[in-house]
Amino acid sequence: MTRFMKLFLSFAVVSCHYGEGQELQVSYTTELQSDFKQGNNWVNLLRLDFTHSLGKHTTLQAATISTARTRPESLADDFQTFSNIEEENHPLALATLGVQQQFGHSSLFFGIRNLNEDYFTSPVTSLFTNSSCGIFPTLSADYQIANYPVASVGLHYELQFTRWSLQASVYNGKGYYRFSGKENVFRFCPQSDGILSITSLNYQQHGSNYHVGFALHSGMYMDYEEGTPEKTKKERRKIIWGYAEQRLAPGLHALLQGSFQSGTSRGCKSYAGTGLTWQCGKTEGGLFTDYARFSPSYEWASEFTWKIPFSGNGFIQPTLHFIQQAGAHYLIGLLRFSYVLPTT
């Protein structure tokens, strides 16, 4: 894996300096976590994005991620995962690898992709560090779909107008990160892995954003209740969601989220969240709380965060999380630093 990354970096850097219609972007995010008792964790994410023009309307896209942490388990035994970058150590995994074709107002991508590239990426939602603001738990909890840090073979279509946009995707029902072996990221096997299809209709006007979506998924539920992740059961489920980012005043937005899952008795059945974000000079703060109903429990998760830009290409983001479950609660603080290396 390390040799592959070095070769990829070398090729991309050379392309950036000598090729036309090519671009490399390197971003690094690191995060210090503490439970204010005895526990600490250091989480890291390295991402490389590479694009190469294959023609007037055709582009080759590739992105890799590498994750590392110093602690083998999370500081909190939470259902929603308070940090949206924390994962097990993965030296190298694909986020995207494929070709995108532009057709007027439309675009079509075919290849390896994870759904975090396209969905739940609007500005207000993206401020928060809770994983549920990156993808609603009704869609992701306990199902190994093409969700960070894994990806799968898929098609992604977009239709863009000034205010309206439509997104539609079809993925292999299970995501992977390995490059070889039976369970590799290039695998497409709907018979055993199932299929995940997603559609989202989006509208924006005067600084406000509105989204409504629907997903169909047939796949395998990871049965952790018996302590044996290998034991799975095939299920079909339907998920609907919607969220609004309403501009209340210049630099002030309200956030409202909701989602419901049917067709299965497992995972997250319903989810609702609300929040407020504000700008203070060049900095941005936010307050968010959500409720997720799992089978057979529930979880409240609240977050206070403040994003402080620096040096034009980076930011520092201190955040405080409070998590409440039946019979347990957690207080977690984190300090996130992120920087995008300027390209030449």
Role assignments for model-derived ranges:
Residues 22-24, 56-60, 105-108, 163-168, ...:
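Repeated loop/turn-to-beta-strand initiation elements of outer-membrane beta-barrel proteins
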Residues 51-173, 284-288, 294:
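Outer membrane beta-barrel
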Residues 24-32, 62-66, 108-114, 168-172, ...:
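Transmembrane beta-barrel strands of outer-membrane/channel proteins
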Residues 169, 203-294:
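Detector for outer-membrane/organellar transmembrane beta-barrel domains
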Residues 158, 164-222:
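Loop-centered beta-sheet repeat module
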Residues 34, 40-46, 90-95, 149-153, ...:
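Residues that define the transmembrane beta-barrel architecture of outer-membrane proteins
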Residues 329-344:
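Outer-membrane beta-barrel "beta-signal"
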Residues 46-52, 97-101, 155-159, 199-203, ...:
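Residues on the lipid-exposed face of transmembrane beta-strands in outer-membrane beta-barrel proteins
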